[in-house]
Amino acid sequence: MIQVKICGITNKNEIKYLNILKPEYMGFVFTKSKRQVTVREAKQLSNNLDKQIKIVGVFKDNSIDEILDVINILPLNIIQLHGKEDENFISSLKARVEKSVSIWKALSISDAENIRKYADHKYRDSIDNILIDGDKPGSGETFPLEDICELLKVDSNKENNCNLTNNTCSFFLAGGITPENVAERIVKVSPYGIDVSSGIEITNEDGTRTKSFEKMRSLIEKVRAININ
């Protein structure tokens, strides 16, 4: 079943939307971003979150101690790393967190070498999932689906053929996913899950951006329909 992660949660209304629609994962951003929250803010928001929804903490080039400081206040189900964290860093982090905490590594679609490396079985002890994103995470920019298929050396014209999950490491797909394009992107590359943020947002009168319940619902319904079929 295709999993859904809604990332960049910042307010109580968005928590309410999550509780109604029940994606498998939600994300708090703890690195510099327009969606960044403090650990105290995230803790307060999470108190009202449905316990079935897993919490992902997004970090970028933080120290291990900084990540552990967050976990000590807000128990995370998943640590998502978006920076230049290498294998040694990830292995050290893995050794210092509870076994129940998964580690995901986000990689740019242009970082072909590392995507292939982390998809290899040798890294399964430290990486539980990889997340393939565009070159500007959180920007809403898409990238050609063929880029993933070229990376994996398979035929992009065959439905469900471009499938990293048949390798040794499952992956989440990010990068400009919206309710309008989610079905096509899932069918073409068969990810384990999708990661969405800007694609389900609206711009408010004051210029801020927040999650739209209708867009969130539309996207999740389309993913669920694919799962049923």
UniProtKB/Swiss-Prot annotation:
It is an enzyme of class 5 (isomerase). GO terms for biological process: L-tryptophan biosynthetic process. It holds the Pfam family PRAI. The keyword Isomerase applies. InterPro entries: Aldolase_TIM (IPR013785), PRAI_dom (IPR001240), RibuloseP-bd_barrel (IPR011060), TrpF_fam (IPR044643). Coiled coil: none annotated. It comes from the Bacteria. One of its GO terms (molecular function) is phosphoribosylanthranilate isomerase activity. Its EC number is 5.3.1.24. It catalyses: N-(5-phospho-beta-D-ribosyl)anthranilate = 1-(2-carboxyphenylamino)-1-deoxy-D-ribulose 5-phosphate. Pathway: Amino-acid biosynthesis; L-tryptophan biosynthesis; L-tryptophan from chorismate: step 3/5. Keywords: Amino-acid biosynthesis, Aromatic amino acid biosynthesis, Isomerase, Tryptophan biosynthesis. SUPFAM superfamilies: Ribulose-phoshate binding barrel. Belongs to the TrpF family. PANTHER family: N-(5'-PHOSPHORIBOSYL)ANTHRANILATE ISOMERASE. This is N-(5'-phosphoribosyl)anthranilate isomerase. The gene is trpF.
